[in-house]
Design a protein with these regions (language model features):
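Membrane-interface interhelical linkers
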Residues: 1-12, 20-68, 79-89, 137-156, ...
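Juxtamembrane helix-loop boundary signature in multi-pass membrane transporters
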Residues: 1-8, 103-162, 269-288
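Hydrophobic core positions of alpha-helical segments in small-molecule transporters
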Residues: 8, 35-36, 70, 97-100, ...
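Hydrophobic/small/kink-forming positions within alpha-helical transmembrane segments
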Residues: 10, 14, 18, 45, ...
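Hydrophobic/aromatic residues within transmembrane alpha-helices
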Residues: 23, 32, 85, 111-113, ...
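Residues that define the loop-to-transmembrane-helix transition and helix capping
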Residues: 30-31, 92, 118-120, 181-182, ...
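Alpha-helical transmembrane segments of compact multi-pass small-molecule transporters, enriched
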Residues: 39-43, 97-111, 190-194, 248-262, ...
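Hydrophobic alpha-helical transmembrane segments in multi-pass integral membrane proteins
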Residues: 44-55, 105-118, 161-176, 225-239, ...
Length: 288
C-alpha cells in the first residue's frame, strides 16, 4: 500500500510545479510560498481531524518534536529556494536538479538510517546523476528572462535539492512514533512561520494586496496539490524504505515535463530526452 501512496505523491508533486510556475510570473516567489503554505496548513489539519490524529499531540516525545521542527525548517528552506528557481529558470531545467535530491537522500539513508546500498542501487544513482546533467546542459533556447538570469537558477535549485534530502531523512526519524498526518501538520506550522518571517524580513508583505487574482488562484491550487503530495509522501515514508519512497516521489518529473511542454512550450531535444530516460530508469531501478 505504501507504494501507491508514493506514486500518488509523485502525481501531485508534478502538478505543484506547473501550478506554482503559473502563479509566480509577476508575484514575488517568497510571498507566493508564504501564501500557498497557508493552504497546505489548512489541508494538513483537516486530514488530522478526519483521522482523529489530533489526540496524539500530547504523546509526542521531545525527540520527535525536535526532528519535526528541524524537518520543517529544511522544508521551508527547500521551498523558498525551489520557487525562486522556478521563477527565474525554466521548469525543464529546474525540476531535474531538484529531483536529484534522491541521490543525497540515498546516501544519507545509508549513513544515518542504515539502509543498504546494493550494486544495482549504486548504478541507479549514477544514472540519475548522469540524466540530470544531460537535462540541465540543454541548449540555451529558453526564455529571455531565463537567459538574463544566467545560472543563478541553478544555485537556487541545488539549494532546494540539498534541503529536500535533509527533509526526507529528518522526517523519517521524526515520524517513527507519530501519525503521519499529524507529523505533516506540525511540520507545516514551522514552514509557515519561516516563510512569513522571510516575507517580512525582505519587506514584501505589502505586495500581498497587489497580487493578480489569476496568479493568486494558481498559487492556491499549487498549495492544494502540495498538501495532497505531502500527505501521500509521509504516509509512504512511515511504512516504507526512504531509499525507495524518495525515488518514486521523484517520478513527478514525468508529470512536470509533460505539462511544461503543454503549458509553457518547453521542448526537449534528443540529449535532454535521453537524460530524462536515464533519470526514470534510475528511479525505477530503485524498486527492484
Amino acid at each position: 500500500m505504501w507504494i501507491l501512496f508514493a506514486f500518488g505523491s509523485a502525481l501531485f508533486a508534478g502538478l505543484t510545479s506547473i501550478l506554482a510556475k503559473c502563479g509566480i510570473k509577476n508575484t514575488d516567489s517568497n510571498t507566493a510560498t508564504a501564501i500557498r503554505t497557508i493552504i497546505v496548513l489548512i489541508f494538513s489539519w483537516i486530514m488530522v481531524f478526519l483521522v482523529g490524529a489530533q489526540h496524539g499531540i500530547g504523546s509526542v516525545s521531545a525527540k520527535t518534536w525536535t526532528f519535526l521542527i528541524l524537518s520543517g525548517l529544511a522544508t521551508g528552506a527547500s521551498w523558498l529556494c525551489y520557487f525562486r528557481a522556478l521563477q527565474i529558470g525554466d521548469v525543464d531545467k529546474v525540476v531535474p536538479v531538484d529531483k536529484s535530491s534522491a541521490i543525497l537522500s540515498i546516501l544519507l539513508a545509508f549513513l544515518f538510517l542504515h539502509e543498504s546500498i546494493s550494486p544495482l542501487k549504486l548504478l541507479c544513482v549514477v544514472l540519475i546523476g548522469a540524466g540530470t546533467y544531460l537535462m540541465i546542459t540543454k541548449k540555451e533556447t529558453s526564455s529571455e528572462n531565463s537567459r538574463k538570469k544566467g545560472w543563478s537558477w541553478f544555485f537556487y535549485a541545488l539549494g532546494s535539492a540539498v534541503f529536500a534530502s535533509l527533509t526526507s531523512i529528518l522526517g523519517k526519524v521524526g515520524i517513527e512514533n507519530i501519525d503521519s498526518n499529524l507529523g505533516t501538520a506540525i511540520r507545516t506550522i514551522v514552514v509557515l512561520i519561516m516563510a512569513w518571517i522571510v516575507v517580512f524580513v525582505t519587506k514584501k508583505q505589502d505586495s500581498v494586496r497587489t497580487i493578480d487574482h489569476r496568479e493568486l488562484g494558481f498559487i492556491c491550487l499549487s498549495g492544494l496539490a502540495t498538501g495532497a503530495s505531502w500527505l501521500c509522501y509521509y504516509r509512504a515514508l512511515q511504512d516504507g524504505l526512504a531509499s525507495v519512497v524518495v525515488p518514486i516521489d521523484k517520478l513527478s518529473i514525468l508529470v512536470t515535463i509533460l505539462f511544461s511542454y503543454l503549458v509553457f512550450h518547453e521542448k526537449l531535444g534528443k540529449k535532454e530526452a535521453g537524460g530524462l530516460v536515464l533519470i526514470v530508469a534510475g528511479t525505477l531501478g530503485m524498486l527492484v
